[in-house]
Amino acid sequence: MERLLIHQLLKWKESTHRKPLVLEGARQVGKTWLLREFGKKYFKDVCYINFEQKDRLESIFAGDLSPQFIIEQLSIYHGKPIKPQTTLIVFDEVQEMPRALTSLKYFCEEAPEYAICCAGSLLGIALHEGTSFPVGKTDFLHLYPLTFKEFL
């Protein structure tokens, strides 16, 4: 199966002004599948982080939100080094960890060489926009349910 949005993800990857990406969409439209498939096709490695497993991840985002610290901690969690340009970092269910959303600002400003994509439900992300959302520091794409062309 091929989702048409993968072409926009590829443009995002190749952009010289890339910011962390937030992939929005309703539940169960395929956000996670699309990001993992994109990572498999266009990156050497994918560091997949599911924030529904909060207990194991809260300590990473509890204090210092510097990209260097987060990358070091995620590399330990992932079990191998996270390399700029070759590793796609996927933050799934990002609405469950508001400080992970906040950290995107620092990745945009201090470490734009890292490819970070976030997936989350529209409602969950919208609930956090007023307090910690990194306005202007992220790119957005919206995934809709399968089109007829994609279905065929």
What are the roles of these predicted feature ranges?
Residues 1-152:
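Phosphate-binding site recognition
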